[in-house]
Every structure is written in C-alpha cells, then in structure tokens.
Amino acid sequence: LAEIWKGSAKDKDSAITIAFGTGIAGSVVWNNHVHHGKHLIAGEFSSLLLDGDYQNCEVINFSTRCATSSMVKKEAQVLNLPLEEMSGEILFEKASQGDMAMQDILNETYYHTAIQILNIQTIYDPDVFLIGSGISEQPCVIEGINRYIQEIHAQSPRLVIPVVRACTFKNDANLLGALYHHLAQFEN
C-alpha cells in the first residue's frame, strides 16, 4: 500500500511486491486495491513451486530456495560456520569482495526470482514488480534479477520483459502501508 500511495508504484494501476525474509511474502495490487484472493493467500509467494522430483512426488518451493533465511543457511554451510554467526549483510559483503561461493548463492536467488517474476508477468501482467524488505537495500539485487530476466528473455523472446524496481520505502514499506490502511479506515 505504501508503494501505491507514495512510492515506486504511485502512478500505476497494478503492481506486485515481493519481500524476502524468513519467507517470501508480498502483495498483488489491481486497480489500486490489494487483491487478497478467495483463500486470502494472494501474495504469499513462499509457496510458489520451483522444482521437484516426479518419481518421489517431492517439490521445492520458492522460499526454500530463495528466502533470505535460506540464503543465510547456505552461507553458513559453505563457510562451515554456525548459523547464528551468519547474516544477509555478511553474505552481500563477502559477495561484493569477490567470494565466488557467496556470489553463487545470490545468483541462484536472482535466477529463480527472475523465473517467478516472468511467470507472474505472463499470468497477471502487472505494471511493475517491486522488491522490498532489507534485501532491496542492495542495488545488486535489482541488477541481478534484471540481468537474468534479460538472459531468459533472449532464450524465450515471446516473454514480456517486466519492469522490476526496488521499493521506494525499502524495509519500511510495511509500516507506511499500515499507516495508509489506518488513515483510509479513519476517513471512512
């Protein structure tokens, strides 16, 4: 709501926000209103399926592979350090210093996020995708996602290239969205 109200989707009718954290949440906005869906799960992107094994009927979801918490777990495994000593900040710092293993963790996230965004673009076709939460503070995130979108598009040119940006309010978008919701309720 904050991004539609005063942020990166201010002049847009439709938007998808994606926030990485313990899971992967977000929102689906259509005609400037949040779409909740019949079962109130629209925007719960954690459950989107990425991959699986048909022989054992096992699936891997978006959150398991790409949530910030999952990236930090991979970081701890690669560095053979306790999970409590790891963080997203350390992951990004090591990647920016040239640590190839940390760059691979980030690239895997960018790649799978690009695929999910392209799938959602094909189904829903919003004006813009906005990446929020703490991860959006890192410019390399939007650059990485857009790089993979371009590479995938080169292989599948029928896909529409979506607009992907960082949330204006980054990690505070949820707080400002709650304020907007409160003000809207108060006016009514």
Predicted segments, located by residue:
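ATP-binding/phosphotransfer module of carbohydrate and carboxylate kinases, centering on a glycine-rich
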Residues: W5-D11, L50-N188
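Acidic/histidine-rich catalytic cores of soluble enzymes
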Residues: L1
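Glycine-rich phosphate-binding loop of actin/hexokinase-like ATP-binding domains
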Residues: A9-C66
